[in-house]
Amino acid sequence: MKSLVRVAVTGAAGQIGYSLLFRIAAGEMFGKDRPVILQMLELPDEKAQAALKGVMMELEDCAFPLLAGMVGTDNPDIAFKDADVALLVGSRPRGPGMERKDLLMENAKIFTAQGAALNKVARRDVKVLVVGNPANTNAYIAMKSAPDLNPKHFTAMLRLDHNRALSQLSTKLSKPVANIEKLIVWGNHSPTMYPDYRFATADGTPIIEAINDQAWNANSFIPTVSKRGAAIIEVRGLSSAASAANAAIDHMRDWLLGSNGKWITMGVPSDGSYGIPEGMIFGFPVTTTNGEYSIVKDLPIDTFSKTYIDKTLAELEEERASIAHLLR
């Protein structure tokens, strides 16, 4: 058995948390030879804590061989103590009549506090994935609130968008998703994201040879991927939970265990590549090895792509400006 890993999960009793925890405990995130301790954070109110207790009872009842221990708490200092990995799932959802800027402000308070708690008690090499929306800006806030931790280890989840785009291409081409490589989702985890298959291949053949159809790209593919979350809410009555949890597992597994040379999409702090301001958390194509990621460099950006990348960048710059005063 490998050494155990301490995993902090916020919003642990929520829909995504419930879909996520059992799969982590079963070994799907870190491998079938890595014991885990789950350190679960929920809101301090009675209902949330009772729900968390119920989740912990169910985890006990699964008798997972890899589950070496559990902590359930409303205290971030306890949940993040010595954490190797932190999955920041919980965030304030957008309520009726709430403006986007109000949502940003409410979440800025949460992620400032969580970043500070990570800075105080987590392992110095902790790897952080922000799932709670607006994920890119929440990750930026947490990163800026944890000055003693490695900023490169604060990431946002764009893997759900990546997986959604993979699925759409798979359907269009009648090819298995496993045979499609070099897909990218640029930018913000929001409807402005830009799924880009210009470099993608299916069975080693460039996809643009099979789908040389800019009208389908602009009018069907991009809108379907970018509005998929809203489409699921419309029919399910609830937001994506199982698919989001699955994407979180994919993101962390590939980051920690390696992508084997394959491109994946991660929201990571920019190093200035592709003209994206340094430090901004932005969706890039990356490869991963030995627990570290590298941005895929020097891909040509055509006029069509630049329009979309500029739009998602502008949105992120606006979000960052709206919360800048909270980070001074």
Curated annotation (Swiss-Prot):
Keyword NAD: yes
Cysteine pairs bridged by disulfides in the record: none
Key word Oxidoreductase present: yes
GO BP terms, alphabetized: malate metabolic process; tricarboxylic acid cycle
Cross-referenced SUPFAM superfamilies: LDH C-terminal domain-like, NAD(P)-binding Rossmann-fold domains
Binding site for substrate: R94, R100, N133, R164
Matching Pfam families: Ldh_1_C, Ldh_1_N
List of residues binding NAD(+): G11, A12, A13, G14, Q15, I16, G17, N107, Q114, V131, G132, N133
Catalytic activity: (S)-malate + NAD(+) = oxaloacetate + NADH + H(+)
Key words, A-Z: NAD, Oxidoreductase, Tricarboxylic acid cycle
Positions annotated as active site in the UniProt record: H189
GO molecular function: L-malate dehydrogenase (NAD+) activity
EC nos: 1.1.1.37
Transmembrane regions listed in the UniProt entry: none
Functional summary from the UniProt entry: Catalyzes the reversible oxidation of malate to oxaloacetate.
Database matches in HAMAP family: Malate_dehydrog_2
Similarity comment: family membership: Belongs to the LDH/MDH superfamily. MDH type 2 family.
Protein name, as recorded: Malate dehydrogenase
Annotated source species: Xylella fastidiosa (strain 9a5c)
Gene: mdh
